[in-house]
Amino acid sequence: MAIKQPKGKTVRRLGVNIYGNPKYDKLLDRKPNGPGKERGARKRGKTSVYGEQLKEKQKFRFAYGISERQFRNLYKKASRMPGVTGDNMISLMEQRLDNTIYRMGFAISRAQARQMVTHAYFFINGKPVNIPSMCVSVNDVITTKNKKGIQNLIRHNMSTSQSARGSWLTIDDEKLSATVNILPVTTDIQPVGNIQNVVEYYSRNA
């Protein structure tokens, strides 16, 4: 489910460019204060621990385009997995098909990747897929629909995309395909926020 919020206001409210588009860096330089916080206005008191946890949760939710229900379920799944819950959460978010397409450099944003998946631009192991939230697995092969318009769009995106490509993927720029070699790990990813705060938020609001 896509999250429909004004991206500029979201970036200003969270104080970080969660979408990766350089125009939001410029926006934060011009307007570093959150929406409604005018220059010279009396500052509010220090944000509570709960407030900080909520803010970090929203950073991840909006960056990956995940609904509250999906994100809570993702936390529950991660908490049942072996290992560190926060690391598991990041890995699960990165395994989402829409994010994988974004990490392949085939889309300039996760929102665009989500739309492309919904329109069934891709195949996994030869089968058409249209569910952005599905998770890829090791040895999955992702290929592109053989339509000139789709492939031209992807090649254009590849030339303009500024996202960091996933080191866990082997990407074939000529064939417009990728293979999942390993599952993504946090050491290969620059998180958009403090995932431990997110874990603490859900552990106290389960």
UniProtKB/Swiss-Prot annotation:
Residues covered by the S4 RNA-binding domain: 95-157
InterPro entries assigned to the protein according to its UniProt record, in alphabetical order: Ribosomal_uS4, Ribosomal_uS4_bac-type, Ribosomal_uS4_CS, Ribosomal_uS4_N, S4_RNA-bd, S4_RNA-bd_sf
Any Pfam family: Ribosomal_S4
GO molecular function list: rRNA binding; structural constituent of ribosome
SUPFAM superfamilies: Alpha-L RNA-binding motif
Biased composition (Basic and acidic residues): 25-39
GO (cellular component) term, any one: small ribosomal subunit
Keywords, in A-Z order: Ribonucleoprotein, Ribosomal protein, RNA-binding, rRNA-binding
Entries under CDD domains matching the protein: S4
GO term, biological process aspect, one: ribosomal small subunit biogenesis
Disulfide bonds: none
Annotated region (Disordered), positions in chain: 25-49
Family listed: Belongs to the universal ribosomal protein uS4 family.
Function text: One of the primary rRNA binding proteins, it binds directly to 16S rRNA where it nucleates assembly of the body of the 30S subunit.
Quaternary structure and interacting proteins, as annotated: Part of the 30S ribosomal subunit. Contacts protein S5. The interaction surface between S4 and S5 is involved in control of translational fidelity.
Name the UniProt record assigns to this protein: Small ribosomal subunit protein uS4
Species, as recorded: Treponema denticola (strain ATCC 35405 / DSM 14222 / CIP 103919 / JCM 8153 / KCTC 15104)
Species lineage: Bacteria, Pseudomonadati, Spirochaetota, Spirochaetia, Spirochaetales
